[in-house]
Amino acid sequence: MTTPKAIIFSKNQIETLKKYSEQNSPNEACAILFGNNTDEQVIIKEIFLAKNIDESPVNFTISNEELIAAYGSAEKMKLDVSGIFHSHPVSVPHPSSTDKKYMEINPIPWVIFSNINDEFKAYIYNSGIIQIPVKVL
Ligand SMILES: [Zn+2]
């Protein structure tokens, strides 16, 4: 995937992700974002809320079962897996060293929400961590 110029959410999607992050606090919340990877700008179409099996305030893991289910429903909806979302309940929305490691393995947009400053930021790995503007339409 090339580096998109922006990642675009609807107001409702932003509210859904914020609410889910608050519900999961003090642990990290996670979700899989569906869209269309052919777009120069990634427009998020659907959100697949996932369980953080680590139940940790500093890490997240999505089970293989849920990953398989997510890929299955993306395919049914003729959408691509366009991003990975997780929250940072106790820190700013910058990738942790663990995040950076997994971003390199999985070079699609990573969206991080911080519960402490109510901010969404997106990044992608492309020979280094690059920030992608988050837009709300
Ligand atoms: Zn993180």
Regions found by a protein language model. Give the residues of each.
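Conserved beta-strand-loop surface patch within small alpha/beta domains used
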Residues: 1-81, 90-137
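Short, well-ordered beta-to-alpha junction loops that form the rim of enzyme active sites
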Residues: 87
